[in-house]
């Protein structure tokens, strides 16, 4: 019910009362202050409002209306539960994929600090002492950049806007490109990697993406692909030059036009999206989605709620379908506390 007029027909998450217009999420704290027989106005906390004096049986009272206490930022009532799995597959001799899972959820003085998580998959290219080195190096540089530039400042209370977080995440991917490109020049080989990274802060996710690893979101509305493949076939499909199913079968499906380490500079796709309890995030390499396909991923998400069990089952299905490439996957469940 509305704190001001008592109306009970407001929407659960409504900001204002439909009857009187009071701010539902900002109920003032009102208390009665007795000051004795003197009508002199007492001192009150900054921002508080004081009524005219009220007299009753020789005593003087004031009503003190104080601003509402600061509430927790949206998303502080969430927790992140992650599962992950990487597998060589049934054809390749070497696993050139790397994955990263970092979660942070401290609590200070009974108040929850930012809920933070960094989840990434990198699919290396270049063969022995090439692809596996590139994917590992990219995630090492990205994680250091995010920890120094995002996690530590957030824990110190230096909260950045969503756009600032995304820019820092993209800068981390750019730094990874710099490192891999430099290593490639020194080694004189053609190593490189794709990279998809998801940063979660409270009820928001920031996504940075280069290549054809993918990020998905699963919830009651189904499976949503959050990334666009930087591949020749994906571009052909977008331009109407190939059928959607050719993403799995076209002779040039493995050719990507954007990767980490290929050039001195790289364009990093980015976006910010809301999160809610019940959402599940999936980050995976093409060795998973090419073998299982979107329909198969959705089927497993329906069957298995536990993130680790879902990862294990999806890797099993990818291998049963042929296991033609390395298989890496991270699944993050966004749950209510």
Regions found by a protein language model. Name each.
Residues 1-337:
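PP2C/PPM-type serine/threonine phosphatase catalytic domain
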């Amino acid at each position: 019910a509305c704190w001001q007029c008592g109306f009970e027909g407001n929407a659960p998450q409504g900001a204002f009362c439909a009857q009187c217009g009071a701010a539902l999420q900002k109920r003032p704290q009102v208390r009665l202050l007795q000051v004795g027989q003197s009508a002199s106005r007492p001192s009150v906390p900054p921002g508080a409002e004081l009524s005219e004096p009220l007299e009753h049986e020789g005593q003087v009272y004031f009503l003190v209306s104080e601003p509402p206490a600061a509430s927790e930022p949206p998303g502080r009532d969430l927790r992140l539960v992650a599962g992950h799995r990487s597998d060589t597959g049934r054809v390749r001799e070497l696993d050139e994929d790397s994955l990263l899972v970092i979660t942070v959820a401290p609590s200070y003085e009974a108040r929850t600090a930012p809920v933070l998580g960094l989840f990434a998959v990198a699919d290396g290219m270049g063969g022995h002492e090439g692809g596996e080195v590139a994917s590992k190096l990219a995630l090492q540089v990205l994680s250091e950049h995010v920890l120094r530039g995002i996690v530590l400042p957030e824990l110190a209370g230096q909260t950045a806007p969503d756009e600032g977080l995304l820019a820092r995440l993209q800068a981390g991917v750019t730094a990874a490109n710099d490192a891999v490109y430099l290593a490639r020049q020194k080694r004189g080989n053609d190593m490189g990697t794709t990279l998809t990274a998801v940063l979660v802060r409270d009820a928001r996710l920031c996504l940075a993406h280069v290549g054809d690893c993918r990020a998905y979101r699963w919830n009651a509305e189904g499976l949503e692909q959050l990334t666009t493949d930087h591949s020749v076939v994906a571009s052909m499909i977008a331009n109407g030059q190939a059928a959607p199913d050719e993403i799995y079968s076209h002779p040039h499906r493995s050719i990507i036009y954007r990767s980490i380490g290929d050039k001195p500079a790289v364009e990093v796709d980015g976006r910010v999206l809301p999160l809610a309890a019940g959402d599940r995030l999936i980050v995976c390499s093409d060795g998973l989605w090419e073998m299982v396909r979107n329909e198969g991923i959705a089927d497993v998400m329906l069957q298995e709620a536990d993130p680790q069990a879902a990862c294990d089952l999806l890797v099993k299905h990818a291998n049963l379908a042929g296991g033609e490439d390395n298989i890496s996957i991270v699944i993050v469940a966004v749950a209510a506390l």
